[in-house]
Amino acid sequence: MTLTQQDASTVEKLDETLHEDRILILDFGSQVTQLIARRVRESGVYCEIWPFTATEEKIRAFNPRGIILSGSPASVHDENAPPIPNVVFALNRPVLGICYGQQAMCQMLGGKVESHEHREFGRAYIDIAEDCSLFRGVWARGKREQVWMSHGDRVTQLPPGFRAVAHSEGAPFAIIADEGRRLYGVQFHPEVVHTPHGAALIRNFTHNVAGCSGTWTMAGFRELEIARIRKQVGSGRVICGLSGGVDSSVAAKLIHDAIGDQLTCIFVDPGIMRTGEADEVVKTFRGRFNIRLVHRDASELFLKELAGVTDPETKRKTIGRLFIEVFEEEAAKLGGAQFLAQGTLYPDVIESVSFSGGPSVTIKSHHNVGGLPDRMNMELVEPLRELFKDEVRMLGRELGIPESIVGRHPFPGPGLAIRIPGDVTKEKLDLLRKVDAIYLEEIRRAGLYDAIWQAFAVLLPVRTVGVMGDGRTYDQACALRAVTSTDGMTAEVYPFDFAFLNRVAGRIVNEVRGINRVTYDITSKPPGTIEWE
């Protein structure tokens, strides 16, 4: 397959249609900036997140229909408080300032912001005093609405042209508007789920205020990305590391739809996957989709290298190194490929913002193959780099990938190895697989799987005394974990009823020889992390 002028023209036309309406989100360091982008995308509008340091030239070239200013951990009174670029208001486009974004906008345009002893953190209620385009059809004058606040500073004097349209106990200017210039500010966070109608408010901004029509769809993205892949690859060959996870599965199917047998997938089975997952990968991609697939069973190698390793970080790094080494071996056998496919997502490419001047603390190393392209002298194909995880799942459904794959709970790259605190052995893996399979089977049977962000079992490195029949046992304990979340950044424990937990625990201790005690982890994130290691 060779590139033609028609291919290039197709890419240009599809790209223009899909990205015609776009919103720019300027990031001032908020931990939830990505949630703003997800709400915008959910409204059918393409958007990008850029740091507040973006140049005027770049912002003008992007030509957004509207601009959203994020929150920030900073105060507008800090010596190095992040400023709003002057071009934001020079463009005469609609602007929505959120929390710090509202405060910085007010201060820049002639208002006043002060620290106040009455701070608002968590659930709060605002009273709607006047009608406003920002929430027309969502909230009505005279109503009280629930929102989520997180601020110490507050606006105390509005800039010329603005009016207050809502207030709360701790924020006299909870929502402000300059309808003439289409400038709006909210002291709360509409992007979080704790503001019940926040997504509708953001949709109002993108559609009713900024005039976007909602051209961003996964059907359109699929068509565009297939054309892009054909344009980039031409008649070249692509190899793709297939893990069985959502990202690599969707990337592989999308690329195969574009170039067919020019793609070869390499599936390295490390022996640390859940029950039946390795077989499902082979069955789905080789059998159902007819994708060229190299299947390497490397379980013995991984177990040998992990023997005696107890430190979680060392486990992760060992597994990551082995994946790369085995992948390189198999790729070398194939020979002749010019392109390497990766399931890079948009959160991976967003430029992070730090006000401390130093790197952020590494809580856990992320398992990826970021070192491969330079070492292998190959050009990257990253068909998912514009997408968030939830969009990848939607695209997977558009591509016809089974729900058992696209709807699967997040699973860490190091697999079950980090769900076994201490050293990893085949016996421990077999034990954990049995426990995990029973737990997930019961969750599905109860119709709860899709209501839970992530559920799994952990094999604890402790033995406990028990009684089975007339005899004493001294076997291992396991922990069950289930959380709800929207993005994995924060998580709440799932509130199973006791009857469910009792049923699961009963099955585990009766059906899994070697387990005599079951616990349920009720720790939220923070302070805990979702995974144990």
UniProtKB/Swiss-Prot annotation:
**What positions does the domain GMPS ATP-PPase occupy?**
216-408
Recorded catalytic reaction(s): these are: XMP + L-glutamine + ATP + H2O = GMP + L-glutamate + AMP + diphosphate + 2 H(+)
Q: Which residues form the signal peptide?
A: none
Where in this chain does the record put each Glutamine amidotransferase type-1 domain?
22-215
Q: Please name the PROSITE patterns in this protein's record.
A: GATASE_TYPE_1, GMPS_ATP_PPASE
Q: Does the keyword Nucleotide-binding apply?
A: yes
Q: Which Pfam families match?
A: GATase (PF00117), GMP_synt_C (PF00958), NAD_synthase (PF02540)
Q: Which GO terms describe its cellular component?
A: cytosol
Superkingdom field: Bacteria
| GO terms of molecular function | ATP binding; GMP synthase activity
| HAMAP family linked to this entry | GMP_synthase
Quaternary state and interactors: Homodimer.
List the NCBIfam families. guaA_Cterm, guaA_Nterm, PRK00074.1
Functional description taken from the UniProt entry: Catalyzes the synthesis of GMP from XMP.
PANTHER family on file: GMP SYNTHASE [GLUTAMINE-HYDROLYZING], GMP SYNTHASE-RELATED
The protein's name in its UniProt record: GMP synthase [glutamine-hydrolyzing]
Q: Which organism is it from?
A: Gluconobacter oxydans (strain 621H)
Gene name, per UniProt, is guaA
